[in-house]
Curated annotation (Swiss-Prot):
The lineage of its organism: Bacteria, Pseudomonadati, Pseudomonadota, Gammaproteobacteria, Enterobacterales. One of its GO terms (biological process) is translation. Keywords: Ribonucleoprotein, Ribosomal protein, RNA-binding, rRNA-binding. This is Large ribosomal subunit protein bL9. Disulfide bonds: none annotated. The gene is rplI. SUPFAM superfamilies: L9 N-domain-like, Ribosomal protein L9 C-domain. One of its GO terms (cellular component) is ribonucleoprotein complex. Pfam families: Ribosomal_L9_C, Ribosomal_L9_N. Binds to the 23S rRNA. InterPro entries: Ribosomal_bL9 (IPR000244), Ribosomal_bL9/RNase_H1_N (IPR009027), Ribosomal_bL9_bac/chp (IPR020594), Ribosomal_bL9_C (IPR020069), Ribosomal_bL9_C_sf (IPR036791), Ribosomal_bL9_N (IPR020070), Ribosomal_bL9_N_sf (IPR036935). NCBIfam families: L9.
Length: 149
């Protein structure tokens, strides 16, 4: 029996794939648990349209993420002025929240979960590298510079 997978299943295939399985497995397991759909010509057409729509949405999200990365690269570096000790340690720390507020004040729409600090909170003066990941595997690095007041 031919079915269209609605979810990725280990050892069977990926979502949207047309596969052939035994009749009992399809009728008693895959179809009742909504893991697959009977592969009629109508269902194949509907699923193909849905897949094309999802691909278009994915492409839009990727384009938007790339445009946001270009905007981050135009900025170059973000500068913070903080009080510090003689040992170059700042009073307080700079975290994701502070960086996102600074980027928002520069006119970029940034969520806190899109910014990653590889070494944790920033506690020392100097230049630090921060990772910006707007969508899945699309990311870039930018600099955060901390100077003494």
């Amino acid at each position: 029996m031919k079915v269209i997978l609605l979810h990725a299943l280990e050892k069977l295939g990926k979502k949207g794939q047309l596969i052939t399985v035994k009749n009992g497995y399809a009728r008693n397991y895959l179809i009742p648990l909504e893991k697959a759909l009977l592969a009629t010509s109508e269902n194949i057409k509907i699923f193909e349209k849905k897949r094309l729509f999802e691909e278009q949405q994915e492409a839009k999200k990727i384009d938007y993420a790339n445009s946001r990365i270009k905007a981050i690269k135009l900025i170059g570096a973000i500068i913070f002025f903080m009080k510090s000790s003689k040992k170059r340690k700042i009073f307080g720390s700079i975290g994701v929240k502070d960086i996102s507020k600074q980027l928002i004040s520069l006119g970029l729409l940034i969520k806190k979960n899109e910014i990653k600090l590889p070494n944790g909170l920033l506690h020392y003066l100097g230049s630090h590298t921060v990772l910006f990941t707007p969508y899945k595997n699309i990311s870039t690095e930018f600099k955060v510079v901390i100077l003494s007041k």
